[in-house]
Regions:
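Catalytic glutamate of the conserved HExxH
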Residues: 96, 100-108
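Structural recognition of the beta-strand scaffold that forms the well-ordered cores
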Residues: 1-6, 103-104, 125-128
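Zn2+-dependent metallopeptidase catalytic core
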Residues: 2-47
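Short pre-active-site segment immediately N-terminal to the catalytic Zn-binding motif
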Residues: 10-18, 77-98
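Metalloprotease/metallohydrolase-associated module, dominated by Zn2+-dependent proteases
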Residues: 79-92, 111-154
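Extended Gly/Ser/Thr-rich low-complexity repeat segments
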Residues: 15-27, 70-78, 140
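Active-site-proximal beta-strand/loop segments in catalytic clefts of secreted hydrolases
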Residues: 6-8, 64-66, 107, 129-131
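Catalytic zinc-binding patch centered on the HExxH motif and its immediate surroundings
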Residues: 52-88, 116-121
Length: 154
């Protein structure tokens, strides 16, 4: 299975180096996961938006150097949506990117939303803690989700 996130970058943090780091972080989500009870090889990538990219599959990521526009000031992405804003100074290469990209893929948080702290019963997955492990919960949620990503069976 191939998961592609066609993405347009903007913001003061959208330097060539930060865009490359973002793409590397997304590519690092690739691996073998349990999808629907079957071990499945999954490749995850960021692609450029081209004229042929369906509008519904186009994502916009704003990279900022400091607090985001969210009331908390933290990185965020629309759940199953097309837009996200990431603070490149906050754990940018330590899990924030896979966490927020998983939101775009339709996967919700597992941590305690009241405290913002990881839920010990929910393990070390990227949707419970950052940094965390990209696991079958996150990848399976993207594969099975209905969001602004392009999925292709190989």
């Amino acid at each position: 299975v191939k998961i592609s996130f066609p993405t347009k970058f903007s913001g003061d943090g959208a330097t060539p180096k930060n865009i490359a780091t973002f793409k590397e972080q997304v590519a690092s989500m690739s691996g073998t996961y349990d999808i629907g009870g079957k071990e499945t090889r999954v490749t995850v990538e960021v692609t450029d938006i081209e004229r042929s990219t369906p509008r519904a599959a186009r994502n916009e990521i704003k990279l900022v150097s400091g607090e985001t526009s969210h009331r908390s000031g933290r990185s965020f992405a629309e759940l199953g949506g097309k837009k996200g804003e990431i603070n490149v100074l906050d754990r940018f290469d330590k899990g924030v990117v896979p966490h927020e990209v998983s939101h775009l893929g339709g996967v919700d948080d597992l941590y305690d939303k009241t405290t913002g702290l990881p839920n010990p019963a929910r393990g070390d997955g990227i949707m419970n803690r950052v940094p965390g492990v990209v696991d079958s919960h996150a990848i399976g949620g993207i594969v099975d989700g209905d969001s602004a990503v392009q999925r292709r069976e190989r």
